[in-house]
Amino acid sequence: MGSLNVSIVTPDGPVYEGVAQMVIARTKAGELGILPGHVPLVAPLKIDIVRLKVESGEEWVAVNGGFMEVNGEEVNILADTAEREQDIDIDRAEKAKQRAEEELSRAKEQKVDEVMAQLALQRAINRIHAKEHN
């Protein structure tokens, strides 16, 4: 089986550069599995985990929105933010989740920006999920 050159980049710089046999990502249209030779595409990403099937097993990256471009044997992900599972501070992620839940509760009571609170909660849960998947 061939391989894919994968790049995950945020405005702050590269998060992942490497080779994978498969990339699995959740787009706005649903989950996609990308193998070498996949048709070219550009797809908006949801807040979710990008799973990279590599020789040593699987790597998870918490991606918070952005776009995925597939072109030949290359997969480029331009993410709003992204963190590899080994870089996630679980205590910080748990605190962010708690703050987001509290903000969401206040938002419902005070009719303030509920959408922003829901997004913050999704991002925190996504980071926790990436860190605790094993």
From Swiss-Prot:
It is a peripheral membrane protein. Pfam families: ATP-synt_DE, ATP-synt_DE_N. InterPro entries: ATP_F1_dsu/esu_C_sf, ATP_synth_F1_dsu/esu, ATP_synth_F1_dsu/esu_N, ATP_synth_F1_esu_C, ATPsynth_dsu/esu_N. Transmembrane segments: none annotated. SUPFAM superfamilies: Epsilon subunit of F1F0-ATP synthase C-terminal domain (SSF46604), Epsilon subunit of F1F0-ATP synthase N-terminal domain (SSF51344). It is found in: Cell membrane. F-type ATPases have 2 components, CF(1) - the catalytic core - and CF(0) - the membrane proton channel. CF(1) has five subunits: alpha(3), beta(3), gamma(1), delta(1), epsilon(1). CF(0) has three main subunits: a, b and c. Belongs to the ATPase epsilon chain family. This is ATP synthase epsilon chain.
